[in-house]
Amino acid sequence: MNTIKKFGLSLLFIICLIIALPFQSCEPEVIDVTECDTCIVAYKPNIYIYPQNNIQLTVNLGFPLGGEIITSIPEYGTGWNVFVDTTGLIDNKYSFLFYESIQPDIWQNNYGWITKKSELESFFRKNMADYGFRGKEIDDFIDYWIPRLQNYSFYSIYPQTAKLIEFVIKLDFSKEPDNLLRLFYVIKGHNQLQDKLIEPTIDNFKREGYYTTEWGVILK
């Protein structure tokens, strides 16, 4: 009887181990960016913050799959601790929080748009507005990026939205916004016209309450 009981317990243990193994293998692998040949830089993400009331705020970035900040304004240190007024001005000086980071290249390239170099500005003005960006947010993007996207005749543009970005670069606030818009563009230049891409559905963003917007670019 004792032998049967011991056998049953051993069998139960083995079954539990077999069940547990697949779940353990689903844990994300954290990559050391200093030894990562496939990591890539996210250039110039700008974070705009619009509180309903003046607020003292801590903002933190995290890299669940591995990664690190390589530059920031104001200095990131162990996290931004900033004062933001109702106009979005940060520490009475900055219009946005700026950083650049390196992390694993797992960005999507299944859907997006192909655009001529000559039409880039009009494309981004409309596309960013469709996603929910406004005014200075769009102007800042245009002023910085259009002069830097002049080397190719055509550009493939792949949007990366909040769900995917959050998987790679987490953005946390001591007081969470009511609404958060995060959009990165993966941009790849070509000298020949490429096949048309599957265009994504663009969700409507509500600029209501206390909200935050962020854009950035990954060049390929």
Map each language-model feature to its residues.
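Bacterial N-terminal signal peptides that target proteins for export
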Residues: 2-12
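Bacterial N-terminal signal peptides
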Residues: 11-20
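C-terminal motif of bacterial Sec signal peptides marking the signal peptidase cleavage site
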Residues: 22-25
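Protease-labile, long low-complexity intrinsically disordered regions enriched in Pro/Ser/Thr
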Residues: 27-220
